[in-house]
């Protein structure tokens, strides 16, 4: 089964009915010249890559923006369109006093599957004490965490807050929690590889598209930035497929990855 572990549903039509909110979301997340798409069309696009399940990642920086770019309620709404296909993740802005309560609600009542955090947007390091209450809730409910790692293309984001090595203490303190450092932590690819090798609970995904096309960037990252045999010999079971849609169509990501010929 092909699972896309990195979809940002900013353009999903069920949550784009309010034009002003849609435009604000696209501005915050740096999505431009894009239009909403129906669930039916999106699923046809996923089918071209053989994708049978997708992870939907929200965005909550509401402490500064006033409302989440993509809320937990909106994620829940999309999941309800096809619960066998969509897997919803939660987000909670740790700068808000209500963050822990919101995450508890997401896990206990909305049945969301994990937590997504973008520390680059939050302007805090992964070991900021305000985040630990959220990590504790993930541990309590046995839910994974997907972190933005490396460069974030979203507005008002600073990559220094999500350099892969900054996550090591969290990986060490929470061995029971599976943690994904997304985007292979690009451009700090070797730092990500080192953490994948050391920590059983550390994973990454292939959601990256920053230079060239998918054929070129994947070859550069997985056979040049890493040793040519690192993936096959050491960390193949730590790398999950993720397209990073809507910045790139999933079928392009999948074909680029397949071109490497990994078993």
PLM region descriptions:
Residues 52-53, 61-161:
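Active-site gating/metal-coordination segments in enzymes
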Residues 1-59, 64-66:
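An N-terminally biased module of ancient metal coordination in phosphate/nucleic-acid-related enzymes
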């Amino acid at each position: 089964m092909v699972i896309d572990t990195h979809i940002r549903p900013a353009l999903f039509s069920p949550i784009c009915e309010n034009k002003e909110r849609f435009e604000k979301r696209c501005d915050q997340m740096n999505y431009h010249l894009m239009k909403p798409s129906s669930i039916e069309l999106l699923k046809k696009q996923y089918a071209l890559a053989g994708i049978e399940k997708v992870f939907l990642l929200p965005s909550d920086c509401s402490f500064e923006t006033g409302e989440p770019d993509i809320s937990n309620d909106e994620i829940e709404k999309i999941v309800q369109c096809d619960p066998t296909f969509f897997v919803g993740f939660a987000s909670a802005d740790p700068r808000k006093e209500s963050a822990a309560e919101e995450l508890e609600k997401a896990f206990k009542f909305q049945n969301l599957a994990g937590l997504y955090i973008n520390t680059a947007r939050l302007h805090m390091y992964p070991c900021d004490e305000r985040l630990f209450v959220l990590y504790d809730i993930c541990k309590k409910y046995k839910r994974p965490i997907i972190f933005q790692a490396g460069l974030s293309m979203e507005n008002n984001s600073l990559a220094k807050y999500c350099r892969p090595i900054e996550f090591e203490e969290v990986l060490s303190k929470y061995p029971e929690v599976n943690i994904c450092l997304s985007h292979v932590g690009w451009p700090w690819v070797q730092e990500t590889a080192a953490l994948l090798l050391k920590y059983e609970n550390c994973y990454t995904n292939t959601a990256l598209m920053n230079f060239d096309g998918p054929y070129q960037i994947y070859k550069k990252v997985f056979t040049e930035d890493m040793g040519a045999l690192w993936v096959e010999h050491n960390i193949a079971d730590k790398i999950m497929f993720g397209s990073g849609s809507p910045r790139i169509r999933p079928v392009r990501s999948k074909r680029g990855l397949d071109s490497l010929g990994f078993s």
